[in-house]
């Protein structure tokens, strides 16, 4: 999980979701693409 000021989709499988007020990127194809804004 990378913590970044700016989260972006890194591939076409990445999805942007908002959980508890935190924007996250989840990716089914490449777990290394997981990100959290903070």
From Swiss-Prot:
Q: Which UniProt keywords apply?
A: Ribonucleoprotein, Ribosomal protein, RNA-binding, rRNA-binding
Q: Does the keyword Ribosomal protein apply?
A: yes
PROSITE patterns reported for this sequence: RIBOSOMAL_L36 (PS00828)
This protein's source sits in the domain of life called Bacteria
Per the record, the GO terms for biological process are: cytoplasmic translation; translation
Q: Name one Pfam family in it.
A: Ribosomal_L36
Sorted alphabetically, the Gene Ontology cellular component annotations on this record are:
cytoplasm; cytosolic large ribosomal subunit
Q: How does it assemble?
A: Part of the 50S ribosomal subunit.
Protein name (Swiss-Prot/TrEMBL): Large ribosomal subunit protein bL36A
The protein's organism comes out as Escherichia coli (strain K12)
What gene codes for this chain? Answer: rpmJ
């Amino acid at each position: 999980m990378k913590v970044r000021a700016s989260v972006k989709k890194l591939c076409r499988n990445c999805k942007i979701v908002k959980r508890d007020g935190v924007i996250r990127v989840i990716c089914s194809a490449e777990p290394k693409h997981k990100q959290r804004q903070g």
